[in-house]
Amino acid sequence: MSEECTHDCSNCSAACSSRDAAPQHDAPNPNSSVKKVIGVVSGKGGVGKSMTSALLACAMARRGYHCGILDADITGPSIPKLFGIHGRAMADDKGCWPIQSRMGIDVMSINLLVENEEDPVVWRGPVIAGAVKQFWTDVVWKDVDFLFVDMPPGTGDVPLTVFQSLPVDGIVVVASPQELVSMIVAKAVNMAEMMKVPMLGIVENMSYIVCPDCGNHINVFGNSHVDEVAAKHHLPVLAKCPIDPKLAELSDAGMIETYGGEFLEGAADACEKLLKK
């Protein structure tokens, strides 16, 4: 190793015995074309990760990009419900085809493959991880600008499989305002660093609720700690999303695409910058 080594192998052309091996990702379906893969993660469940994935895909679709959502939360899939998709994904000699939403967003989820969407998926970790991998290798993601991967919470088999198998270009961490978020976000950030996957920033969900009478912001979960957590990890806060009963109503009705909130524009900007690099 040279004394001048910066330990940044990505920007070095030297033939060095200390060079990190290039990641060996699984090849996508031969008929797929995906420009950027964005992972949406959370350290715990119930923070609105799937809703963030859906709204971010909608925000990018409104900007004219063709988006897809790979629902990697095999045991708790909710993406089809948010978009009002209840059909069965079809397959041919080219592969399995995602179902398109009203806005043209490609969606693939385990709920689009089972006979009854209410049937539980009682699989062990390796089988679940294998299914997620097949959503990349067997599904035809045709001319997709941004593929958002809605991951299950935590740092278990599925996130590890996604980071190892898919060429993830960036990660968005979804968190809530509680102080506990510091430890939870740290776990997600540390895993991303271990897997050498770049972090785009943090989205704080359920940040506040707007009083319908006076318009003031009410911090339902107390004062937010996301700014200090983001500063600690040198990450930007991409958005602070409110609790909005209208969003919950539209999500339950499968009409999330009609929601007009613009609070994820900062996160959309971060994704768009990846495409322009």
Language model: regions and residue ranges:
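Phosphate-binding loop that captures ATP/GTP phosphates
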Residues: 66-67, 72-117, 122, 129
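Walker A/P-loop phosphate-binding motif and the immediately C-terminal alpha-helix
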Residues: 31, 36-74, 189
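Phosphate-binding/switch loop-helix module in NTP-utilizing enzymes
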Residues: 114-162
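Short glycine/serine/threonine-rich phosphate/pyrophosphate-binding segments
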Residues: 49-54, 77-80, 151-159, 180-184
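Residue-level signature of catalytic and energy-coupling elements of molecular machines
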Residues: 34, 45, 71, 79, ...
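Conserved Switch II/interswitch segment of TRAFAC-class P-loop GTPases
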Residues: 142-149, 155-156, 167-188
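Glycine-rich phosphate-binding loops of nucleotide-dependent enzymes
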Residues: 108, 132, 151, 164, ...
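C-terminal lobe/tail of nucleotide-utilizing enzymes
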Residues: 1-25, 189-277
